[in-house]
Curated annotation (Swiss-Prot):
InterPro entries reported in the protein's UniProt record: Aldolase_TIM (IPR013785), Elp3/MiaA/NifB-like_rSAM (IPR006638), MoaA_arc (IPR013485), MoaA_NifB_PqqE_Fe-S-bd_CS (IPR000385), MoaA_twitch (IPR010505), MoCo_biosynth_MoaA/MoaC (IPR050105), rSAM (IPR007197)
Disulfide bridge positions per record: none
Pathway assigned to this chain's UniProt record: Cofactor biosynthesis; molybdopterin biosynthesis
Protein name (Swiss-Prot/TrEMBL): Probable GTP 3',8-cyclase
The gene coding this protein: moaA
Biological source species: Thermoplasma volcanium (strain ATCC 51530 / DSM 4299 / JCM 9571 / NBRC 15438 / GSS1)
Length: 326
């Protein structure tokens, strides 16, 4: 039986945060809406909550971090999840460990990966991530393809005056590697919109999307968040470019069918909120966890509502003023 929240949104998938540690230091990382924490959920705890979620109709899992490949028990975790989930199991990763782990992850039951690559050239890559690993990420994409962790999605957070000029190269790279390129809007909470980093680097993607749409051979829709995906032709062949535009986007929230699980053992109803979290860590009784799961679903509500998109103009005005003062 699929559970539906009070806004008519079914919960069809889980986004499971395996840890909060990472070997990159991207300044815009939202850390899945959590803080750096200590002990993470054990494999058997993750298995238990997946088993319960599956009883409620969940059949799709996304593994995230931090950086999930830093967990030494990652293969075991994937195997445990696959016992219950017949749908898609995917993982978001920076890719550093993929050349080593790709085949074992596929064998364990992982279907595909999202690989974060926020710049095409080495200098910008290092400026964003704090590490000199651009070439290794290219190898990670190749390793994922060779292992069958496909289709690979390349996550690219668009940052004004930092990596926008590299989007054409990223599109060609995605086409060459038979990957899907996800152009992702830099997102934050309402309070975070006034931060220096956000005002400096946030860029609405509407004009960029129109440019891509004008070149598109066809368009698809990702049911999650109703995200548009354009098929365009490049020198390396056809490629899919998907736009992820969450900031002040009521339509994005209206199509959210995902419940999050934090590494500390909480059901998290929304990336942007922690006040509605429901803790299940330390509870072994499946009946009790099932009830907590129900509670979490009923606490879900859209973060962005109709009318919030209008205030985006105020945020843009602040950004323009700040950048003129540079």
């Amino acid at each position: 039986m699929v559970l539906t929240d009070l806004y008519g949104r079914p919960v069809l998938s889980l986004r499971i945060q395996l840890n909060t540690t990472c070997n990159f230091n991207c300044f815009f990382c939202h850390m899945e809406g959590t803080e750096i924490s200590g002990e993470a959920l054990k494999p058997e705890e993750i298995e238990r909550v997946v088993k319960i979620a599956h009883k409620f109709g969940v059949n799709k899992i996304k593994l995230t971090g931090g950086e999930p490949t830093l967990r030494r028990d990652l293969i075991d975790i994937v195997k445990r999840i696959r016992k219950y989930i017949t749908g898609n199991i995917s993982m978001t990763t920076n890719g550093v460990m993929l050349p080593i782990l790709a085949y074992e992850l596929k064998k364990a039951g992982l279907d595909r990966v999202n690989i974060s690559m926020h710049a095409f050239d080495e200098d910008t890559f290092q400026a964003i991530t704090g590490v000199n690993s651009r070439d290794r990420i290219i190898k990670a994409i190749d390793a994922a393809n060779e292992a069958g962790l496909t289709p690979v999605k390349i996550n690219f957070v668009v940052l004004r005056d930092l990596n926008v000029d590299q989007i054409p190269d990223m599109i060609e790279l995605a086409a060459e590697k038979h990957a899907i390129l996800q152009l992702i809007e830099y997102e934050t909470t309402r309070e975070g919109e006034s931060s220096k980093e956000y005002l400096k680097y946030h860029m609405p993607l509407d004009s960029l999307e129109k440019e891509i749409a004008d070149k598109a051979l066809s368009i698809e829709r990702n049911e999650l968040h109703n995200r548009p995906r354009y098929i365009i032709r490049t020198q390396a062949g056809e490629v899919k470019v998907e736009f992820v535009k969450p900031q002040r986007n009521p339509d994005f929230c209206a199509h959210c069918t995902r419940l999050r699980i934090t590494s500390e053992g909480e059901f998290k109803t929304c990336l942007m909120r922690s006040d509605t979290n429901v803790k299940f860590k330390g509870i072994n009784d499946e009946k009790t966890i099932s009830e907590l799961f129900r509670q979490a679903v009923l606490r879900r509500e859209p973060y962005w509502r109709p009318g919030d998109e209008v205030r985006q103009n105020e945020v843009l005005a602040k950004s323009i003023i700040q950048n003129k003062r540079k």
